[in-house]
């Protein structure tokens, strides 16, 4: 791809890697840390929801990285209640070849003894019975539990009827996250490269409100600029955005 030079200049970029950039505190990460602390200290059931790509998982892992009493489980579409219990037991060092009842009792005792806070990420994949089991774990252990996922997680809990209608009322604290702010985007861009105001603005315009897309876009733009042996320009950023699967 041949790119003509424009006036936005960059003195140099940092080495390109496929790992995440250094953690940058954002408005959403501050909210996540605050909710996590309240859930941990007050032993509540909490919920955090937000669209994909805004840094939920990254912030949760950063929070847990600094503590020994946090267990994060990432749910997926295979997470039946049994799979969830086995996954928690595996992380707690509990034998998983036992009956479901014995595994449940084992994790209850281990969590109480260790005073573990449990975080379930991508919790929109959990069936309602799985969420009810988390409620039961909370009742039995007195430990804080946080579920985090896409906006439909909260909508699904609010719409529960019949035997599960009470679950939503058990949530003691929560937050709905917004798209990253312009300040957040600028800080992330500048953690990855030397960038002036106009360059940051261009990345903000093309990031579609997603930190995940933003990080990919910055890396792609730097690579394209290096291939063409020129600074990152608005045109390069726009062309690089077209190459991303948005």
Specify the residue positions occupied by each region the protein language model found:
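Mid-core helix/loop region of P-loop NTP-binding domains shared across ATPases and GTPases
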Residues: 2-11, 80-87, 94-144, 180-188, ...
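Phosphate-binding P-loop
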Residues: 36-43, 111
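Walker A/P-loop nucleotide-binding motif
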Residues: 40-62, 76
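Sensor-1/coupling segment of RecA-like P-loop NTPase cores
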Residues: 45-52, 137-164
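Residue-level preference for the first positions of well-ordered beta-strands
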Residues: 45-47, 69-70, 115-117, 144
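Conserved catalytic segments around the Walker B and adjacent sensor/switch elements
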Residues: 67-77
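A short helix-turn-beta junction within AAA+ P-loop NTPase domains corresponding to the substrate/partner-engaging
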Residues: 68-70, 160-179
């Amino acid at each position: 791809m041949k790119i003509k030079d424009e006036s936005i200049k960059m003195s140099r970029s940092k080495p390109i890697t496929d790992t995440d950039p250094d953690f940058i505190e954002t408005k959403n990460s501050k909210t996540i840390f605050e909710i996590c602390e309240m859930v941990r200290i007050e032993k509540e059931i909490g919920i955090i929801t937000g669209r994909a790509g805004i840094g939920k998982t990254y912030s949760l892992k950063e929070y847990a990285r600094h503590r020994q009493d946090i267990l994060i489980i990432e749910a997926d579409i295979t997470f039946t209640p049994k799979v969830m219990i086995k996954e928690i037991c595996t992380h707690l060092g509990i034998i998983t070849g036992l009956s479901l009842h014995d595994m449940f009792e084992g994790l209850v005792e281990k969590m109480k003894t260790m005073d573990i806070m449990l975080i379930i990420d991508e919790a929109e994949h959990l069936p309602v019975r799985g969420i009810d089991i988390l409620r039961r774990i909370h009742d039995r252990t007195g430990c804080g539990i946080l579920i985090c996922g896409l906006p439909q997680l909260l909508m699904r809990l609010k719409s529960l009827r019949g035997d599960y209608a009470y679950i939503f009322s058990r949530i003691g604290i929560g937050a709905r996250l917004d798209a990253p702010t312009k300040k957040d985007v600028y800080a992330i861009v500048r953690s990855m490269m030397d960038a002036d105001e106009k360059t940051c603005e261009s990345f903000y315009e093309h990031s579609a409100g997603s930190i995940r897309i933003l990080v990919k876009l910055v890396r792609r733009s730097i690579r394209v600029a290096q291939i063409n042996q020129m600074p990152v320009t608005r045109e390069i950023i726009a062309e690089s955005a077209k190459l991303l699967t948005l």
